[in-house]
Amino acid sequence: PLYSSAASDVYKRQVLIGAAKYLAQTRNFDGTAVLIFQPAEEGRGGAKAMLEDGLFDTFPCDAIYALHNWPGLKPGTIGINPGPMMAAADRFEIQITGRGGHGAHPYQTIDPVTIAGQIITALQTIVSRNVNPLDSAVVSIGSMQAGHPGAMSVIPREAKLVGTVRTFRKSVQEMVETRMRELVTAIAGAFGGTAELIYERIYPATLNTPQHANLVADIATEMIGKENVVRDLVPSMGSEDFSFMLQSKPGAYFRLGQGGADSGCVLHNSHFDFNDAVIPLGSAMFCALAERGMPLAD
């Protein structure tokens, strides 16, 4: 069997290089350990591109593991969940078309801004009224564009909304998209306009295989003690392109605690400072996963 560990940022490369050095020197495993230095975690996902290029055809493996540092966990801790770790990420764009005109004569127009406002409000009812409260979903509008910033008395012809949907379950994801299409079409029509919803599924949910997640937790417990291992880490509504690899191979994605959240230096913050002291633990986890997954014959 082969084990693989994915990385995309500088610190994760350092973690993998440390693991590679130890595994090459000790050879305390029977098999091949594949270390994946994945580019382009952000954007449209380097993991998917690597899979499309035949990653697992060139480097077959039976299981795959990845880690990500986590400011919300104290240094020297490991966090994992035997099921969902991160949500699916969808992008949507709503193009609204009305009839432009003078702001002093709105009755002669079909105002796309008014339609946009109604759609924004209605979309928030999907989570509160259509999603089972025992499930999780997010519908967020990140951008609204209409008219010219300096045109105080011009009602534009068009407006555009851009946002994201986050879900864990595919059935919830499909229901949210269906309800969005129904609401967008009906609301625009009710005001005399039209609207087109462009819905794109970017990242699937990051779902750990219970067997492999439990192995991570067991190894971490032996290594750093059960008091430093969170086995039921609360899933994040953020997204991760390692999810594509977990769709192809069983495995697990876990968190490497690094601290710093209390000071506000969280991920994607310009003042973020990676805690170099946690690198050895990350390397040790990957080494132990390779050795435990591919033990030497007695």
Language-model-detected regions and their locations in the chain:
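Zn-dependent metallopeptidase/amidohydrolase metal-coordination segment
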Residues: 226, 230-296
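Buried hydrophobic packing segments
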Residues: 12-23, 116-119, 123, 283-290
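Divalent metal-coordination and catalytic microenvironments
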Residues: 35, 50, 102, 116, ...
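Short, low-order "capping/linker" segments at domain edges
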Residues: 206-219, 223
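Single conserved hydrophobic/aromatic residue that forms the stacking wall/gate
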Residues: 1-7, 11
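Acidic/histidine-rich catalytic neighborhood of metal-dependent amide-processing enzymes
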Residues: 14-82, 132, 146-149
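Short alpha-helix boundary/capping segments
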Residues: 8, 104-112, 274-282
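Midchain, well-structured core segments that form catalytic/ion-binding scaffolds
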Residues: 59-208, 235-237, 243
